[in-house]
Design a protein with these regions (language model features):
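Non-catalytic cap/lid and distal C-terminal segments of serine-dependent acyl enzymes
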Residues: 1-149
């Protein structure tokens, strides 16, 4: 796991990480806001809408103040696999930015578009193995495509 951004925000840090995903067979990015003294605190996962990345929510929403004040960690994954070898489509509703948080069942999407497993298994395992947040106080919410996730 590689830290690619870190910014002080209220009483905590906004970070962005890149890691090699076994589920999506490519590098993935996610954002993490963690308040200071963040042991055994609740974790919320935010799922962004279509065409977004992990950057949209962390740059536009202002959630960091609330999360800091209420001692809540917030994880924001990218919405799909990305990269040179990732299948894409001209229609914005398919391909990069449009993973729909589902596992693909057909080619050419099958190898990389396994976002359900990424969101429900791999990413929570990464967070649990690297941070001492609560394992029992976990929630998920989203907007647009992410609201159906």
């Amino acid at each position: 796991m590689e830290l690619i951004e870190k910014h002080r925000s209220f009483q905590g840090y906004q970070e962005v990480y890149r890691h090699s995903s076994k589920v999506t067979n490519c590098d993935m990015q996610f954002a993490l806001y963690s308040p200071d003294n963040c042991i055994d605190i609740p974790v919320l996962y935010f799922l962004s809408g279509i065409t977004c990345t992990e950057q949209n929510f962390i740059q536009k929403s202002g959630f960091q103040e609330f999360a800091s004040k209420n001692q809540i960690a917030v994880v924001v994954p990218d919405t799909s696999p990305r990269g040179e070898n990732i299948p894409d489509d001209e229609d914005y509703k398919l391909g990069c930015g449009a993973g729909f948080y589902l596992n693909a069942t057909q080619e050419p999407w099958l190898k990389h578009y396994n976002m359900y497993d990424y969101i429900t298994k791999e990413l929570p395992d990464i967070i649990a193995n690297n941070y001492k947040f609560s394992n029992s106080k976990v929630g998920i919410f989203g907007h647009s495509m992410g609201g159906g996730g």
